Amino acid sequence: MGNCAKRPRHRAPKDRELRPEEIEELQAAFQEFDRDRDGYIGYQELGACMRTLGYMPTEMELIEISQQISGGKVDFEDFVELMGPKLLAETADMIGVRELRDAFREFDTNGDGCISLGELRAALKALLGERLSQREVDEILRDIDLNGDGLVDFEEFVRMMSR
């Protein structure tokens, strides 16, 4: 599979060349999920990574992609080949990873990488302009908090914003 140092021109197949800011957006999303910084993301993280770019893959699409991936991992060049056409086809109103990351940081006031119950309450008050009851905030958190740890991490935030 590819190495981004070898192929500096990023092309989306059968389409115009990706602009530098589009490459940067793909790079930011890729790096977000390349947690061990080995230049690859696993099939499991690929779906979450795609969602940060505003693309909602079905389980079937992810299974098909995983069958095409050798070794269960995707490097950045393969990621560009996969996501380039989707990025080029996206509509102007789709939210990119940079905007999602900025919004997440606004809510994560202590910068620990998670949105706590208190931070969520403050964010909802700022967004809605009214104070919600403890029960309402708990209900919202339960709906968003997929892993049940009482916090909203970036992936859970992306899923919430994509609904």
UniProtKB/Swiss-Prot annotation:
Top-level taxon of origin: Eukaryota
Binding site residues for Ca(2+) 1: 34, 36, 38, 40, 45
Keywords associated with the record: Calcium, Cell membrane, Cytoplasm, Golgi apparatus, Hearing, Lipoprotein, Membrane, Metal-binding, Myristate, Repeat, Sensory transduction, Vision
GO cellular component: cytoplasm; Golgi apparatus; perinuclear region of cytoplasm; plasma membrane
Record-level GO BP terms: sensory perception of sound; visual perception
Localization per Swiss-Prot or TrEMBL: Cytoplasm, Perinuclear region; Cell membrane; Golgi apparatus
Residues involved in Ca(2+) 3 binding: 145, 147, 149, 156
GO molecular function, one term: calcium channel regulator activity
Lipid attachment points (N-myristoyl glycine): 2
Topology in the lipid bilayer: Lipid-anchor
Pfam families, alphabetized: EF-hand_1, EF-hand_7
UniProt-listed CDD domains: EFh
Domain EF-hand, first and last residues per copy: 21-56, 72-89, 95-130, 132-163
Record-listed Ca(2+) 2 binding positions: 108, 110, 112, 114, 119
InterPro entries per UniProt: CaBP1/2/4/5, EF-hand-dom_pair, EF_Hand_1_Ca_BS, EF_hand_dom
Summary of the function given for this chain in its UniProt record: Required for sound encoding at inner hair cells (IHCs) synapses, likely via inhibition of the inactivation of voltage-gated calcium channel of type 1.3 (Cav1.3) in the IHCs. Required for the normal transfer of light signals through the retina.
PANTHER family: CALCIUM-BINDING PROTEIN 1-RELATED (PTHR45917), CALCIUM-BINDING PROTEIN 2 (PTHR45917:SF2)
Protein name, per record: Calcium-binding protein 2
Species per Swiss-Prot/TrEMBL record: Bos taurus
